């Protein structure tokens, strides 16, 4: 009888090989992530974005935050800018600043994407005959504060508004601009989603779902049209110091819109789905690769319950 230490345990070789394969797989994934990261964050220059793909860039939600920063960055790269937003006064001010600072042409179209009746006919007329190289679908709206679905103030109107602004505007603006890009065989569409669309976020459920739509729509559209010269990118920022996020002072992980956009534009052509900014990319990798979705949802619920309580407490004190 063979000594116990020499007895072969059935299947032990199989488990060893499985372990080696798993380690090799994770090693390969890590290497690919590092390689793609270096390509985007070190070598990226956004060379695909500029007047050579079309004279004009169209930016929705162009008078504040990330939209304004995209308009200015594209103007800095030599593109003429069509600014679309709700307030004619803020549009005039933003257009004047861009024209004087970057010496490019500007055009403004006042439109309230929350009230879509007939606005797309007006936008289509305003864009007619323009050589549009870049479309930035940025306009968006979120909750005033985290809230349970059935307790959202003015729920019916809020749903209509959020779906019209966050989803329908992306589809409709793409419908208007994409044919011209296809006709020339080149163009870039940048759809601003959110890190909230990477996994469900309780108490921001509708907003999170609309941003997940933008991400899926972008990636599907890119697969449909990439062989025809069209580059569609889904941009998923974490917190940026904007009015929408209610953050006033930029930090390393909550950058100014200008810092964020300068970084994000450099990833165009290198990443079809991007968090746009290196610290955000690290947070995105951790939250989707290392943290189980169930844990991310639980953490989101806990954080937003705290934010909700603090908001309602302040409101009651007023």
Swiss-Prot record:
Keywords recorded for this protein, A-Z: Endoplasmic reticulum, Lipid biosynthesis, Lipid metabolism, Membrane, NADP, Oxidoreductase, Steroid biosynthesis, Transmembrane, Transmembrane helix
Record InterPro entries: NAD(P)-bd_dom_sf (IPR036291), Sc_DH/Rdtase_CS (IPR020904), SDR_fam (IPR002347), VLCFA-Steroid_DH (IPR051019)
Gene3D superfamilies in the record: NAD(P)-binding Rossmann-like Domain (3.40.50.720)
Pathway assigned in UniProt: Lipid metabolism; fatty acid biosynthesis; Steroid biosynthesis; estrogen biosynthesis
Membrane topology: Multi-pass membrane protein
Cellular compartments per GO CC: endoplasmic reticulum; endoplasmic reticulum membrane
Transmembrane segments: 15-35, 187-207, 281-301
Catalytic residues identified in the record: 207 (proton acceptor)
GO biological process: estrogen biosynthetic process; fatty acid biosynthetic process
Molecular function, one GO term: very-long-chain 3-oxoacyl-CoA reductase activity
The UniProt record lists the keyword Membrane: yes
Function, in words: Catalyzes the second of the four reactions of the long-chain fatty acids elongation cycle. This endoplasmic reticulum-bound enzymatic process, allows the addition of two carbons to the chain of long- and very long-chain fatty acids/VLCFAs per cycle. This enzyme has a 3-ketoacyl-CoA reductase activity, reducing 3-ketoacyl-CoA to 3-hydroxyacyl-CoA, within each cycle of fatty acid elongation. Thereby, it may participate in the production of VLCFAs of different chain lengths that are involved in multiple biological processes as precursors of membrane lipids and lipid mediators.
The protein's name in its UniProt record: Very-long-chain 3-oxoacyl-CoA reductase-A
Native species: Xenopus laevis
Gene: hsd17b12-a
């Amino acid at each position: 009888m063979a000594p116990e230490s020499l007895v072969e345990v059935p299947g032990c070789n199989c488990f060893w090989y499985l372990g080696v394969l798993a380690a090799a797989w994770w090693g390969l994934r890590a290497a690919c992530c590092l390689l793609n990261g270096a390509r985007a964050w070190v070598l990226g220059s956004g060379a695909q974005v500029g007047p050579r793909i079309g004279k004009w860039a169209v930016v929705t939600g162009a008078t504040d935050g990330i939209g304004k920063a995209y308009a200015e960055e594209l103007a800095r790269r030599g593109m003429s800018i069509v600014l679309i937003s709700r307030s004619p006064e803020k549009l005039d001010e933003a257009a004047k600043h861009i024209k004087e600072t970057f010496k490019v042409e500007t055009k403004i179209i006042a439109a309230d994407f929350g009230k879509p009746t007939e606005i797309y006919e007006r936008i289509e007329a305003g864009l007619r005959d323009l050589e549009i190289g870049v479309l930035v679908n940025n306009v968006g709206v979120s909750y005033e504060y985290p809230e349970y679905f059935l307790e959202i103030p003015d729920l019916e109107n809020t749903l209509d508004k959020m779906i019209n602004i966050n989803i329908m505007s992306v589809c409709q603006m793409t419908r208007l601009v994409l044919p011209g890009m296809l006709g020339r065989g080149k163009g870039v569409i940048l759809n601003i989603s959110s890190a909230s669309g990477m996994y469900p976020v309780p108490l921001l459920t509708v907003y999170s779902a609309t941003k997940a739509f933008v991400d899926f729509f972008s990636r599907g559209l890119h697969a449909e049209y990439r062989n025809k010269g069209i580059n569609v990118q889904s941009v998923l920022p974490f917190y940026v110091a904007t009015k929408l996020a209610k953050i006033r002072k930029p930090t390393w992980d909550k950058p100014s819109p200008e810092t964020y956009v300068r970084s994000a534009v450099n990833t165009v052509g290198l990443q079809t789905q991007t968090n746009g900014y290196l610290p955000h990319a690290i947070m995105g990798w951790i939250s989707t690769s290392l943290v189980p979705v169930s844990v991310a949802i639980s953490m989101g619920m806990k954080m937003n319950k705290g934010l909700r309580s603090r908001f309602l407490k302040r409101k009651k004190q007023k």
